[in-house]
């Protein structure tokens, strides 16, 4: 069975590619390498059933040809990262909305099962304690470009469900809540790799806002486990499902944990948002907590990796990338005190 993964050279897509190959699927990755990189697929190239196609989901001819050769499609290609979205609002909208339309249209033509990756950003400013999939989207004003991402991904969800109801397309939509792990790039504003990179270099760890805002991080291998199970679940077709952790951590606490685990001398510096994003267009949420009752009910899934373990595993990759001397990290000599799982 062949799986087409759009955006498969990216952070999550490359991990999914490896997992599917290990489970004896054939995998085709379509990626324009705008934010992904071939290095992420280094292990995938070792498998005879792997194919990489450099190209864009905006190229309808290429997309249709690859969908025709595939038994399932996982649509991960998207504009990602706060910095990228703020700098490229038009490209964000076009890639996310038009690219998803092209993929869904090809999948509907061939009747190919499809999983569309969405985001917790679609909940916007909703302040509910635990966000269920049917919770309202409370999006900010059009004058703030950061909302172009959330709005475009919400339209992707509408498109997916419309293709399901109109054309009978077997489609699943997943909403990711802050997936982290090896291969996540710091350059697009992703918080954990930025903290880790600064700590390893002994540079200031910059915490935006007041540091009391919280997020719920999910390790990439837990996310991949959920995706694989959903692809094998006919009951999940036509559904939207959260993939995330119910356990919160503040950004200041996260920075402190990274500093402690690395054994870094870095200072933690609080940076107000107007200094972090002087060009404007940014607005942050105080907290965003997923309800995972639905996905647990459908496939029995819940994340198992603690925050400290996520940090350690991500540090190990960054450590190798920066070619720092072995034994530098504090966690190599003594185990960290694990965060309480509330």
Locations of regions flagged by a protein language model:
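N-terminal Rossmann-like NAD(P)+-binding domain of SDR-like oxidoreductases, especially those catalyzing
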Residues: 1-177, 314-327, 332, 337-342
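C-terminal substrate-binding subdomain of Rossmann-fold SDR/epimerase-dehydratase oxidoreductases
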Residues: 16, 178, 199-342
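Short, surface-exposed alpha-helical segments at coil->helix boundaries
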Residues: 38-41, 157, 193, 252, ...
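Residue-level signature of the cytosolic catalytic core of signaling kinases
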Residues: 46, 127, 184-188, 247, ...
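A short acidic, helix-capping loop that chelates divalent metal ions and anchors anionic groups
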Residues: 82-86, 181-182, 276-280
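A short, amphipathic alpha-helix embedded in the catalytic core of nucleotide-handling enzymes
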Residues: 105, 163, 195-198, 226-230
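The catalytic Tyr-centered alpha-helix of NAD(P)H-dependent dehydrogenases
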Residues: 144-152, 176, 184, 188-192, ...
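Hydrophobic alpha-helix immediately C-terminal to the catalytic Tyr-X-X-X-Lys motif of short-chain
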Residues: 155, 159, 163, 195, ...
